[in-house]
Amino acid sequence: MPIPPAASAQQFDRIARRYVQHAAVQTEAAKRLLERLDGLRFQPRAILEVGCADGRQCQALKQRFPGARVVGLDFSPGMLNRARSGRGWWKKRYELIQGDGARLPLADGCMDLVYANLSLSWIPEPERALAELRRVLRPDGLVLVSLFGPDTLREWRGALGRHSISGIFLPDVQQLGANLVRAGFAEPVLDTDWITTLHGNAEALLDDLGGSALLPDPGARELIEAVRQKSDQLTDASGRIRSTWEIVSASSWAPQPGQPMRSANGEEIHIPPDRIGIRRRN
């Protein structure tokens, strides 16, 4: 069952102060998503980051495109406060606004690049969110999105039990591609990435999951005990326990006027598998 937006915002509010300490996966996924811009002859004038969290990727986007207007949006007041406090001399370099990724408070066709690193995973209406990203893009604008895939934390699903991350949207790569085309994007190029993290013990793993809003109650006693028992099977030679993260990501262009733009409730499109480019890497 999807997590209601208000509950997600409150969850991120609670962990805002310690988020950056537990966001190693998010940071690596963001780095890989930005790499999709390498080699492109593309100079956006206006950039939106959906789910800007602590603002670090707004800074990275501004550094990459210093002449562009950069706007960071997040639904969590706590996260926005952290982003503002960490902005420092960047204050005049990028803007921060509060809003829902499925109902963007922005005009049609006002952005050249929309960037969303893992943030759409927490939106209960992902197809509507993708349609919103399409709406605010100008023709020939680019969207870069990444989400957690269905095999994220696969080795821990049994131990997590009712505390599982099942309330988060976990599309496979084909589903993400189909959703992008239904939203009106042209010929998405998709990747599946795998990230492995290592933790000193069960408590360290749960602390990272809680500190990145993937578990609402990482301190639950029965959860700690279940993860401790499972960790014996997942310990490497150095004595650390591992976790696997699947990241599905895409880049896609907004078509020129005259080509159809479809909302989540619009016309169904059948997509031949050979029309969706998929790459896999570790």
What are the residue ranges of the model-derived segments?
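Class I SAM-dependent methyltransferase SAM/SAH-binding core
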Residues: A46-L104
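A short glycine-rich, Lys/Arg-flanked "PGG" loop and its adjoining helix->strand segment in the class I
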Residues: E127-P139
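A short SAM/SAH-binding and catalytic strip from SAM-dependent methyltransferases
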Residues: D112-E125
